[in-house]
Amino acid sequence: MADAFTVALTLLSARELSETQLRARLTRRKLDPDDIDTAIARLKQDGTLDDRRVARALARMESSIKHRGRTRVIQKVRQAGIDADVADEAVSEVFEDVDEHALLERALERRLRGKAPRDLDDRNRARIVRGLMAQGFRLEAILKKLQ
């Protein structure tokens, strides 16, 4: 049976993982908990495992590629098992370079499908607002754009 360090390196070679994600995957493989702790400590020491780097990469992907708002990006980063302070710091760092209003504008245009906001009935307006809020945009910003 492979040791925890080798398995961890194999998993990390496929994609970046947070410490929590890596620990869960190693545990599912029924590896010795002490070996898992040792492997994770070694990976953290040599910089192979870095939750800050994972948080920044995940925040960049969620904001730039998936066009999510700040709230949803923070939620996604925290779901990866990253500490709340590290997640908030990474998202703030990424959103320094992101125009949230442009993100919202683009998401709204996709949802409107060429219609003007004033042409929406109440049902469709509510549907669009719920969808944009689920993407992590603030209600105040959404309502302002819909006026």
Region locations from a protein language model:
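An alpha-helical, amphipathic repeat domain used for nucleic-acid recognition
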Residues: 1-147
